[in-house]
Amino acid sequence: MSGDSKVWAHASADTWAVQNGISTYDLDTSSIKREKRDHNEQFNDGYGPPPGSASADPASYIADPAAFYNLYTNMGGAPTSTPMMHHEMGEAMKRDKESIYAHPLYPLLVLLFEKCELATSTPRDTSRDGSTSSDVCSSASFKDDLNEFVRHTQENADKQYYVPNPQLDQIMLQSIQMLRFHLLELEKVHELCDNFCNRYVVCLKGKMPLDIVGDERASSSQPPMSPGSMGHLGHSSSPSMAGGATPMHYPPPYEPQSVPLPENAGVMGGHPMEGSSMAYSMAGMAAAAASSSSSSNQAGDHPLANGGTLHSTAGASQTLLPIAVSSPSTCSSGGLRQDSTPLSGETPMGHANGNSMDSISEAGDEFSVCGSNDDGRDSVLSDSANGSQNGKRKVPKVFSKEAITKFRAWLFHNLTHPYPSEEQKKQLAKETGLTILQVNNWFINARRRIVQPMIDQNNRAGRSGQMNVCKNRRRNRSEQSPGPSPDSGSDSGANYSPDPSSLAASTAMPYPAEFYMQRTMPYGGFPSFTNPAMPFMNPMMGFQVAPTVDALSQQWVDLSAPHE
């Protein structure tokens, strides 16, 4: 018996079968020795486990981990995991990782993997010289890297010693090929994305309606005048702008709102509307046309802010600067627009040309800006007696007194919820000859500049009685409205005034209780009281219940007023 046979002579057939997972027990010593020699010959390439180890091929463990456990344990009910098994598996994995790291193709694999990461995450920004950031991680640059790698390998060929491992070499080559394909796919995806973006931009430029942009640029082509170079209106006998006329005061070129405030809407002293109204009083217009040049120094003699020449009854002419105001629905550039339409002194202001003014507001709300532009929007009335050659009525630029009356009547009838529904907007637009957009803009401005000052004034006065308005609370269903429609034909709009002192007399409709404002603690000295329906409820929770009031005299109860 040889030396190898003596080594395994003391071990029985059962012990060898248990350790190696062999199910047969009639094995002799020679067969055991031959099988063990086969295991040793499998790892003679220098990368496997050392001779004498009982582990099998490490590549098979990855595909079938159970084979590794069955190699050391029996198929019976014994535990399938022991510390020795984990130690052996960790050692084998460590040797496999070291063999991969020491492979000559590993630096090329790392370089290609980094290129794929850069191609995925790097933005494709074009620099000034025309090169993009993707040139570093492009597929074409990999050829240069490959040539550099081959040159470096050939230079260091005599310094490196490598034992061939066909299985590991095949894995490395397949990994490099897979990453190479992935890099090509990433480059193709970026190319398709860039092509799509370019075609999309070209399509937008071809189909985008640029006529509106061109109109805005044409309207704002005049150079803006600095506010410091403008003073009061001077007297000049020349109708041109080149005369010695002193420019009048010019407000800021952009103002998003054009509805007059209730505080200065009724001023008749001739002072110009300052602040955000962007309009001038027309009370001293005739006096400015007929008076001498000394009257132009007074602030009350400012005429209408309109371009062109104003002719007086005495024959004297004065040159007006072209003043235009940008509204939210007109031009967004906020520039100046020069109009040359003369406005006669004998012409009533109700029949003034709409093209010569953009923002006009008279004391008492006789006129108000529509919020329309020269873009050809038509009103809701498709045909009318005053229609143009196209059969459609031209949208007026200035609100008439009747339109203002209807709007104000509806607003003060529905102060608790000043949001008209779509049907009511259509009805108001049909009655006034305006567009729905103009009606909507008027109510937006009115809620901010008429209703909100009333609320602020009541809050400053320390009383919250009649003015309890639902602020910023829209209906879920726009078809319903808490107030009546102005199509009833009532002339009650003339009785309404934005003055809060006369509001109680002019608004007889009771207001509903705003329970949503009473969710937490009472405010403004309002005493808390318990809910009779739920006496044990925390007073800090839920809604409060109003005290008993005569139902015939007042249907709704306002909880914002102090109670005894």
From Swiss-Prot:
UniProt GO cellular component terms: chromatin; nucleus
GO BP annotation list: animal organ morphogenesis; brain development; embryonic pattern specification; eye development; lipid homeostasis; mesodermal cell fate specification; muscle cell differentiation; neuron fate specification
InterPro entries: HD (IPR001356), Homeodomain-like_sf (IPR009057), KN_HD (IPR008422), PKNOX/Meis_N (IPR032453), TALE_homeobox (IPR050224)
PROSITE patterns the record matches: HOMEOBOX_2
DNA-binding region in chain numbering: 392-454
Principal location: nucleus
Phenotype upon loss of function: Worms exhibit severe posterior disorganization during embryogenesis (Nob phenotype). Mutants exhibit Q cell migration defects, affecting cell position along the anterior posterior axis. RNAi mediated knockdown abolishes nuclear localization of ceh-60. RNAi mediated knockdown targeted to the intestine represses expression of vitellogenin genes; further repressed on ceh-60 mutant background.
Domain of life: Eukaryota
Keywords: Developmental protein, DNA-binding, Homeobox, Nucleus
All copies of domain MEIS N-terminal, residue ranges: 133-218
Residue stretches of biased makeup (Polar residues): 328-344, 381-390, 455-469, 494-503
Stretches with biased composition (Low complexity): 219-230
Compartment list: Nucleus
Any single Pfam family the record assigns to this protein: Meis_PKNOX_N
Function: Acts redundantly with ceh-20 and ceh-40 to perform overlapping roles during embryogenesis. Required for postembryonic development of the ectoderm, including the Q, V and P cell lineages, playing a crucial role in ensuring that these cells and their descendants undergo their invariant patterns of cell division, migration, fusion and morphogenesis. Has a role in the mig-13 pathway to promote anterior migration of neuroblasts in the Q lineage. Required for multiple roles in regulating vulva development.
PANTHER family assigned to the protein according to its UniProt record, in alphabetical order: HOMEOBOX PROTEIN TRANSCRIPTION FACTORS
UniProt similarity note: Belongs to the TALE/MEIS homeobox family.
Assembly and interaction partners: Forms a heterodimer with homeobox ceh-60.
Name of the protein: Homeobox protein unc-62
Organism (species): Caenorhabditis elegans
Record lineage: Eukaryota, Metazoa, Ecdysozoa, Nematoda, Chromadorea
